[in-house]
Amino acid sequence: NWARIRRWAMTNGYHFATGQCGVVSGGGPATSSNHPVVKIGWYDAVKFCNARSQFEGLMPTYYTTAGQTNVYKSNVVDLTSACVNWNANGYRLPTEAEWEKAARGGMTAREYPWGDALAASNALYAAAGTSNVASYAANGYGVRDAAGNAAEWCWDWSGSYADRTAANPTGPATGTVRVVRGGSWSNASAGLRCAARASLVPASSNTVVGLRCVRR
């Protein structure tokens, strides 16, 4: 999907500065197109969600202003919640709260998406690079790769949980770093916990962070 949609997007007004399919030892891209996208910054991850929406004939989610008239396709724009059509049927990044609920798969008190113990058969971690997506069993909600392989950008600016509203929080209104969840192929076991949190400057891209598109 990444290469096909990216090619279409680049001829339809989109611009991406980052992104590659998977990573092998040494940092190069994987030879298989079934690896997760990595080396993608937050801005490009958001734009890709819009591109995938339009490619599939769905309503895009992200706009450059609160008026929601111009679809976000290029440049660096620090979007606010008002720039998001939360009711659109297109793709977007999950909020941090949505990500954790989906990752837990209905098990609210467990360390990992599958339980409290971690084995090599559960997820890809402490490895030399990415692997094919969906190589490991799904959790109780049918979600795969919520832990390991590629960490995932979330919508939210990073902030204290105390600042969140109780229902369907979308994170702080402003910030300097965006939330990253899930742990990756390079993490040790602690980074794969459902509650583990990380954050990065949204313009940054590296070989451990990718994205997961979600929709209503």
Question: Where do the protein language model's features map onto the residues?
Answer:
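A short glycine-rich, aromatic-capped structural motif
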Residues: 1-17, 36-53, 97, 148, ...
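Low-complexity Ser/Thr/Gly/Asn-rich repetitive segments
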Residues: 112, 214-215
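Functional-site microenvironments in short loops/helix caps that host divalent-cation chemistry
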Residues: 31, 40-198, 205-207
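Short glycine/proline-rich turn/loop motifs
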Residues: 10-34, 128, 193-198
